[in-house]
UniProtKB/Swiss-Prot annotation:
SUPFAM superfamilies: Rhodanese/Cell cycle control phosphatase. Catalyzes oxygen-dependent 5-hydroxyuridine (ho5U) modification at position 34 in tRNAs. It comes from Streptococcus pyogenes serotype M12 (strain MGAS2096). GO terms for biological process: tRNA modification. This is tRNA uridine(34) hydroxylase.
Length: 328
């Protein structure tokens, strides 16, 4: 039996001087111990997800904690059967979370060390979910929500996190006087967004401390009131959260049956994320539309080495055709 792999999810807002130099040093250490993952380092802090065996991840956590700036950094740990990443990336960015405030005339960025919402533990957050006078906002991207979310949470009509401030301003009259509670995967986005809500004048703002990842591990709530699975930005794609009465809420793009398997459309110029079973991925050559299925650079066709005849036969089976100039 192969050794278990640990996946570490973490962040911390803290001032990092010479952050670019620190990012290079960080990458060098990670590679020296064989760690895999993706880490963002900015002047405002660090945000990462990494994976490795027990010894490797323990070395990494000990090394990070040995730096007084990160002595109290909170690692959220999952155990898996295989690596969640194939390579090691450490990038320097201007921010570890980009809310897009300065880009969209929303004044200056938020410093969560100065302004942020009240921290709620899993039990308190569950109580908020059941409170009719509390508005619960999902701050993640649309494709994350579609895979899984808290029961009763509002799905803002946005595609990504940077569009959220404008959506709130457009709809603030609906919940300005109510208590507003927000959540995200591990907490890093909510630290900044809840602070922005406070600055916008919302009087009672809370956030799920440690994010969905922590809620699912809490021995008391055990992920209850979460529907579906949680989207993660690594090779796992999704992880279970509700250990009381789990459900599948996402549906196969092609036939509407329950499905939690995310794939990207095979047309590289589309790349839309869709739910699809292996059977339907094969049947529809992973294309989300007739145009994508017949696109000359269809990646499914290339990856599976389909001949032009095999490709054409797949499309004919679903009532479509391959243009003469494609694959000729």
């Amino acid at each position: 039996m192969s050794e278990k792999i640990r996946v570490l999810l973490y962040y911390k807002y803290v001032s990092i001087e010479n952050a670019q130099e620190y990012a290079a040093k960080h990458l060098e250490f990670c590679k020296s111990i064989g760690l895999k993952g993706r880490i963002l380092i900015a002047d405002e802090g660090i945000n990462g997800t990494v994976s490795g065996d027990y010894e490797t991840t323990q070395k990494y956590m000990d090394w990070v904690h040995s730096d007084e700036r990160f002595a109290d950094l909170w690692f959220k740990i999952d155990e898996e059967n295989q690596q969640a990443f194939r390579k090691m990336f450490v990038r320097y960015k201007k921010e570890i979370v980009h809310l897009g405030l300065e880009d969209n005339n929303f004044d200056s960025d938020i410093n969560p060390l100065e302004t942020t919402g009240e921290y709620l533990n899993p039990k308190q957050f569950k109580e908020a979910l059941l409170d009719e006078d509390t508005v619960v906002l999902d701050t993640r991207n649309d494709y994350e929500y579609d895979l899984g979310h808290f029961r009763g949470a509002i799905r803002p009509d946005i595609r990504n996190f940077r569009e959220l401030p404008q959506w709130v301003r457009d709809n603030k009259d609906k919940f300005m006087e109510k208590r507003v509670v927000v959540y995200c995967t591990g907490g890093v986005r909510c630290e900044k967004f809840s602070g922005w809500l406070v600055r916008e004048g919302f009087k009672d703002v809370g956030q799920l401390h440690g994010g969905i990842a922590t809620y699912g591990k809490d021995p008391e709530v055990q992920g209850e009131l979460w529907d579906g699975a949680m989207y993660v930005f690594d090779d796992r794609i999704s992880v279970p959260i509700n250990h009381v009465n789990p459900t599948v809420i996402s549906k196969d793009y092609f036939d509407g049956t329950p499905c939690e398997r995310y794939v990207n459309c095979a047309n590289p110029f589309c790349n839309k994320q869709i739910f699809a079973s292996e059977e339907n991925e094969t049947k529809y050559v992973r294309g989300c539309s007739p145009e994508c299925r017949a696109h000359e650079r269809n990646r499914y066709v290339q990856e599976n080495g389909l001949s032009r005849q095999e490709w054409a036969e797949r499309l004919e089976a679903i009532g479509e055709s391959l243009p003469e100039f494609v694959g000729a």
